[in-house]
Amino acid sequence: MQTHTTPMYKVLVACEYSGTVRDAFASKGHEAWSCDILPSETPGNHIQDDVLKHLDKGWDLMIAHPPCTYLSNAGARFLYPKGKLNEDRYKLGLKAKKFFIALYNAPINKICVENPISSKIFALPKYSQIIQPYEYGHPIQKRTCLWLKNLSELKPTDIIFKRQST
């Protein structure tokens, strides 16, 4: 009798210091590592460093959560306070975009980059999918974009309410 086994991956969770996603993969038998400039909040495999220095270490899968402070639509109002472009914030946004693109184009076969809806001014690549936390058992609404490479779209697993149309 043959048994089907899921292949185990060497997983990098970029821009994570909580250990939550890393530990979820580890609990399924994967060799999972988190990487962030901050120390990990929990014991486990963690690289405290700039993740860009570690993208070529033979990872099979990367889940990336790059900071969204300067890229998200929510922060767009700070780009044009009083109707004038805040050039310092714009430069920080361009730096954040460069970091995002470096993660998205990493030499890793399977990639998922997660971020909120981005400000159009930074022209990020088109996302693959938008998900909502309430589709996965969390009682909140927060449109979250996923940029996927060689991965299937996520399917809702626990829809706890439907979005109300406005």
Report each predicted region and the residues it spans:
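Conserved active-site and SAM-binding loop architecture
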Residues: 1-166
